[in-house]
Amino acid sequence: MTIRSFDLLQPRSLPEAVAMLARHGDDARALGGGTTLVILMKQRALYYPYLVDLQTIPGLAEINVESDGIRIGALVTHRRLECSPVIRASFPALADAFGQIGNVRIRQTASVGGNLAHADYRLDPPPALLVLGAEVSLFGANGARTVPLGQFFRGLYETVLEPAELLIDIKVPFMPENSRAVYLRYNTLSANDWPCLGVAAFLTKANGRCRELRVALGGLASTPVLVGGLDFIKDQTLDSAVIARLLDTVDQQIAPFADLRGSEWYKRLMARLFVKKAVEQLSAAW
């Protein structure tokens, strides 16, 4: 099926892009990598008479190392993040998450900003970015603002982005010393399909004890879940009793819904299993 005709607008700056989106309102949509948007338009599930091409704006496809972290431009592709020596050295779990999306052809085109702005509940990167403490930079008619990633997602395919506002980059702070993170994906269908669930965990240890633990899960509910109430783990060893309490805490904070990849009951069971696996994997790394 072919796409209905549309006008491709090519701004040269962020203010120009925002002005184009504001001018055309609901008839316009920002175009990044286009892997999802183009497919939906081909399927006639969506139609926009105007697409604002962000590829013509300089600076949105850069990975910049800053004093306190790494800033990733919205148009950086999944494949570049998967293979980047800087990302693999500083955030191997993040590289793993991006490397498990779809297939190489998709990863060569899809952009990190478009991935997050689409807000599909099955996305791989959000859990990994959440446990790493990422924040996103947004730009609109009122200028720039920064939002913690945990506050960015509002619901299924819904974010805090205002009309004519763009996600322009993602900032990931460097991990403290003696910290590690991991991302695990569980598939029930093909490897190229959406995951049944994804689990990310971040652990900081000192003298054999846990200083901080963060856990996030995706693919279960309309938004990714960053598990709260884990302060009880501080200064504890991750023995079977502590892990059992952790799993109960996770279980209380998730509300899986059924889809083609698993029932509510099955996803809840797999969430416990993969959180346990992720935490044990991190703990054993020292």
Where is each model-derived feature located?
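C-terminal structural segment of proteins
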Residues: 1-286
